[in-house]
Every structure is written in structure tokens, then in C-alpha cells.
Amino acid sequence: MVTALQTRNLTKVYQGKEAVSDVNMTIKQGEIYGFLGPNGAGKTTVMRMITNLVKPTSGEIEFFGEKMTPGSYEMLKRMGCIIEYPVFYDKLSARENLMLHGEYMGYYDPQSATAALELVKLSDINNKPVKQFSLGMKQRLGIARAVMTKPELLILDEPINGLDPVGIKELRDVFRMLSREYGMTLLISSHLLGEIEQVADTIGVIREGRLMEEVSMESIRGRNSHYIELVTPDSTKAVYVLSHQLGLNNFKVMDPGLIRIYDDGITLSDLNKALVLGDVGVENLSRKHHSLEDYFMERIGGEGIA
């Protein structure tokens, strides 16, 4: 598969401190790459370097095999992006904002503005001044602006902020369509792990400026994908029952009071019976599916995401 974007030892130093350190990222053409990390981990800084908004301290960025430089303006025209909060001319309409953007990018196709507004469900209000738009509507317009020039790489930093559940699902479908039907490559950061899980092909996890791992969603789903979750005030007793009375060894104490059991050979009823007979308090016992959130929290150690 063709590599759309690759970074080599990408580093950014601010006031003597590394905000991003030796990031080696590989994104394949046509895939959706979910970029995850705690608040301040370096996600936005990486995106800003890729889009030439911030100059790297060291390292390289290649776009379809061609090295990017501060003067790579033609290369940047092949990208669309939303970095942080999208800004518009508030007194102009959605369509007028898109037409101005097209002119700035040297992309003169009025139909592309119409198509982009239809894509994000804004075609019925394209003449309303943007100052009357809600946060979610502005976010949709930002995505329309990013895709109207038909970029090869779409970079979206928290693209579903401010959207209601219906809007989130609609954009999720848009992202899939852009990737599957148009062959567009997407780099998306989001704090909504459940949404990334539903659309991403590959996940990159960054922490304290370092890319910890790149892994396919298929691989994540295949890692101990099913388990039993036990919530108990008696973890020590529970561990004794699991190991000594039931002979189980494939389990993990996640937190005080939370144990995950990865043994497929025991039923919930048998497990509950053994715990009760062992005088273990059981607050909850249920089967779970190993999710992207589980994977992420294991990697970043409970810092949370933003």
C-alpha cells in the first residue's frame, strides 16, 4: 500500500523543552488514522507541523514520498485541515466563505462549494451569515471547507466538537465515505474514543510528545477481546478464590475493586457461585468486550484524554 504521510524523527522544542520528540508516523493512502493522546501530549503540535503552521526543530515530513519544506505550497494545496477551532468571516454566508477559500487555494469550482455544503448537511442554510451559526454548524462548515478542494490528505483536530449524537453519526458516515469511496486519507484526533473506534483503520498513541505505538484496529480487537469484569470490595479475597479455588491464572487486577478475567472456560453463574461461597462481595459481574478505550487506558496509565 502507498504511504501517504511519513514523519522521521519529527521533533519540536519550545523554550528548551521538547513538545514533540522523535515521532515516526506512517499513514497509508486511503486509511483513517486515529491520533490519540492525553491533553498536552503533542497531537496538535504534530498536526501543525504537518500542515506547515509550525516549523519542526528537527526531523522530516514526507508527503507521498516527497520531502516537505517551508516552501512546499503546492504540496499543502493537496491537504485539507481543521486545526483547533475553525475561524470564518462571520458576516459572510457559508457559501461565500467557501468560495473565498477556493479562491485563496486557487481552486475555482463553484460546484465544489455546493457539494461540500451538501455533504455536511448545510446546503439549506448556505446563505445565513456565519455569525448566526451554532458551534456544531461552524464545525460542519470547517469540514466542508477542508474537503471542498478534494484533498488527498484530510487532517482533522477534534472534528466532532459541539455536535449532537445525530450530527456525530452523520459525520462518521462522511469520514467513511471519503476514505472508502474517494480514496482520501484521513488523520483524525478526538477525545471520543468510541467514535474513533468505529471509523479508524489504524491508531497512533502519543504521550508526552513521543509516539508510543501504531497499531491496527483489527489487532486491538483481537487482543483478549472478551473478558469478565468483576467489581468487588474484596479484591484480595477474590484473587484467592480465582487462583486457588478455581485454578484460574489469566486475570488482571485493574484497580482496587476491579478485576478482569480472560478465561473463556468459566461461566458467569459458576464464577458467581464460587465467589459467594468464598465470602467475596460481588457488586457487579458481567461479560465485556475489549474496547479502544481499554487499550488506550492501558497505554497511557489512566491520565485520561482530551
Would you name each region that the model predicts?
Residues T11, R95, L119, L193, ...:
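Alpha-helix N-cap/helix-start and coil->helix boundary motif
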Residues V2-T7, K12-I188, L193-R207, L211-E213:
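ABC transporter nucleotide-binding domains
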Residues H226-R299, A306:
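Short, charged/small-residue-rich alpha-helical element at the C-terminal edge
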Residues R172-Y262:
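ABC transporter nucleotide-binding domain
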Residues K67, Y108, S123, L248-N249, ...:
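Short coil/loop linkers at secondary-structure junctions
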Residues M1-L5, G302-A306:
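Short, Lys/Arg-enriched, disordered terminal segments
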Residues I32, V87, E152, G183, ...:
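Generic structural signal for secondary-structure transition and capping sites
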